Amino acid sequence: MDKLVIEGGVPLRGEVSISGAKNAALPLMAASLLACGKHSFTNVPRLRDIHTMCNLLGHMGASSEHGATLNIDSGNIRALEAPYRLVKTMRASVLVLGPMLARHGFARVSLPGGCAIGARPINLHLSGLQEMGADIELEHGYVVARADRLRGATIIFDLVTVTGTENLMMAATLARGRTILKNTAREPEVVALADYLRKMGARIEGDGSSEIVVDGVEELTPSTFRVIPDRIEAGTYIAAAGITGGCLRLTNCEPAHLEAVIQKLRAAGLTIETGEGIVDVQSNGPIRSVDIKTWPYPAFPTDMQAQFMSLMTLGNGVSLITEQIFENRFMHVLELKRLGADIELDGRNARVCGVSHLSGAPVMATDLRASASLVLAALAATGVTEITRIYHLERGYEDMDGKLSAVGARIRRQVNGS
């Protein structure tokens, strides 16, 4: 199993180009099922999850080529099924449900691995599709959905759900009549999907707000689209500059998507300047301890919680971090404590007391963002840190070790434990 070996203590200096957003690319790829023909996407990151979605679409009959452009031809869809062997590795696979049902009238999609419907937002997808006229049954771990043609409805989400908003918005594009979605997610990735659907001929208004209105059309046509920059990757590298006392310029990013993150990182003592597609960050003073609470966009994102916690481990006081989106999203805490962090957990709260330094140690990544938090802590720690199970990183960070090495990090990938 591959691992990262990091010798910390080097301030990062230089330029990092931010990749396209995985969380924008995946729903765009699912949207290709809505229209027969060739869809073309640029700025698509080369990540494990992108490869998995290509395999899933390929299983259905679509063909894909990922060079400088990701081309998907959905003209030969024949298998209206998302099998467990593919869905189990990526929860975003459920995004094919709405498009398949809307265009073909049938979908058989495996429940994501370990998913208890009552406790996970997938129930919001299913109840919304039922309100649009779908007949849905659960059979042997699969969602089986049928509808001659979906019909418009007014749907109020009990909780803000990004993938639920995306799934029902896609389904509504081909439904009969008007669909009104209320309490919708406002994330930039939702807006990007709506932008592409409009290029395909969809009639959508209100994306970026808490109410989206979709007037169904008879047919959509393929188009081209550039994937928006990854705001979480950008936030991660800003935090990396902060925790190492470095100076970085980030290019190919969208500062407007990072306002809540930048506000908190400035409060933590970082000097951050923004321009068109650019963020300049410098850290040359003490890290100030700052409290955060995660909440849906435009508030502080849960996907930056772990990385911010790493920064706070070296703060000059006490930071209270409250996770309000997901349960059990403090799995990185035990590993950070192995590096010398002083953190106490109390339910959804983490109390982080800043320490003078972290010390390298063997640690294990538990999920995507936890992996990034361990990399940041290792970059600042004295001595050598070895991080195992780094396949999590490959789900969401394109060439992270290469990008960090280019700005001065002493980092190397050790293949197969050799």
Curated annotation (Swiss-Prot):
Q: Does the record carry Transferase as a key word? A: yes
Q: Catalytic residues per the record?
A: C115
Instruction: Kindly state which keywords UniProt assigns to this record, in alphabetical order.
Output: Cell cycle, Cell division, Cell shape, Cell wall biogenesis/degradation, Cytoplasm, Peptidoglycan synthesis, Pyruvate, Transferase
The question of whether Glycoprotein is a record keyword is answered with: no
Broadest EC class? transferase
Tell me the function of this protein.
Answer: Cell wall formation. Adds enolpyruvyl to UDP-N-acetylglucosamine.
Query: What is the protein's given name?
Result: UDP-N-acetylglucosamine 1-carboxyvinyltransferase
